[in-house]
Regions:
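Active-site phosphate/pyrophosphate- and oxyanion-stabilizing loops and adjacent acidic/basic residues
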Residues: 45, 94, 135
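Short beta-strand segments
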Residues: 54-88, 94-96, 102-106, 114-118
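Generic structural signal for secondary-structure transition and capping sites
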Residues: 55-56, 101, 142, 161
């Protein structure tokens, strides 16, 4: 009887490089989980795809008295930055005026992406920026971007991004840290 040949092992897929100024590593997970530093983490493209495709983004801010506030918004992931708008009198805008630190996560608890950063109000007189955001809104939500004196649009560059999938947790849990100087 002829010997069966073992299937050839394919070379591991080459991971796309992470963005400049970004380092992948392990998130802070208790030692009981048994995680050890490894050579390969989730590629940042995994997080970027989820951020770009997500319909809703949960924005988490803190009230001036420190109490948390979470609310879903629509937004756009464009060129490594998350944009979202709101009414200037909204709770989230008032919170961000007091403390611009923000944590943002997507809907899924099975394919997790969490972004931490600082919300920066964009200049509404920058017509090229508004045109880009309006085009993104029309493509994604089939409606124009709402811009006016009662509104504010924020940009959030990531400082930290966390991601994992439920089926491979904790083995694929990944944290990307961004150099703030490169933002």
């Amino acid at each position: 009887m002829p010997k069966l040949k073992a299937p050839k092992k394919s070379a591991p897929k080459k991971q796309a490089p992470d963005p400049p100024g970004c380092r992948a590593g392990l998130p802070h997970i208790p030692a009981d989980y048994g995680l050890k530093p490894r050579k390969h983490y989730l590629p940042f493209s995994h997080a970027e795809e989820r951020l770009a495709k997500s319909r809703n983004y949960w924005i988490c801010t803190a009230r001036p008295d420190g109490r948390p506030h979470s609310i879903p918004v629509w937004g756009f992931w464009i060129d490594g930055v998350l944009y979202f708008g709101t009414g200037r009198a909204s709770r989230k805008a008032r919170n961000l005026a007091h403390n611009a630190a923000v944590s943002i996560h997507l809907d899924s608890g099975d394919d997790v992406v969490i972004l931490e950063g600082t919300a920066v109000e964009i200049d509404l007189s920058d017509k090229s920026q508004l045109k880009k955001l309006d085009a993104a809104s029309r493509a994604k939500y089939k409606m124009p971007m709402v811009v006016g004196p009662g509104n504010v649009i924020y940009s959030v560059r990531p400082r930290v991004v966390l991601a994992w999938t439920e089926k491979d947790f904790p083995n694929n849990a990944t944290r990307w840290k961004f150099d703030t100087a490169s933002a």
